[in-house]
Amino acid sequence: TAVDPSNRGNTFLSYYTWGSGVALGLDLTLRTSFDGITLDHVMREMWRTHGIPERSYNVDDIEAALARATGDPTFARSYFDAYVRGTQAPRYASLLAVAGIELGAARPGRAWMGNPNHVQMRGGATIVMTTPVTGSPMYEAGLDRGDRILALNGETIDADTSVRAVLQAHSPGDVIAVRYESRGGE
């Protein structure tokens, strides 16, 4: 399903992106839980055991290097089970806070339908350009890629009345009626 454009945004995640996120989570977890230990220590351990002798390695070898670097095989096993073999995401908000980065709502107090780049005015019509992300207000309303938004809260959406203008008159949590055309029908 990852190559199917009809729901790609909800089904595809690059393992490069995921791996970078898991590594960031691991580095920050090490920095907060193990005095003086960082991901660099794990990478040096991997180099010592696999780089100099040029030996191939697998996930279990990296887990073992983490266990040696931290001296805590239970931690290594639980981290790998949750985030490498599993599908959980590290607790980025609390981990990044330790690094001085605060995660929060992009526009608190402002109404939102989903990524504003999902909707574009094309030829006088407001078109949903990409599949709405699962859980977003557009997704919950039933909008899909290629749908044409006709009205929001009874206001016709056209060149004179934009989606942004209607949303600015509302607050987060407001329920806004959406009239739209999907696959030729309303």
Q: Regions from the language model: what does each represent?
A:
Residues 108-151, 155-159:
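PDZ/PDZ-like domain segments forming the peptide/carboxylate-binding groove
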Residues 24, 44, 60, 64, ...:
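Solvent-exposed, polar/charged alpha-helical surfaces in well-ordered, non-transmembrane soluble domains
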Residues 23, 80, 124, 173-175, ...:
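Active-site lining segments that contact anionic ligands and/or coordinate catalytic metals
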Residues 69-70, 99, 141, 170:
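Residues at alpha-helix termini
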Residues 144, 150, 156, 161-186:
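PDZ-domain C-terminal substructure recognizer with occasional recognition of PDZ-binding tails
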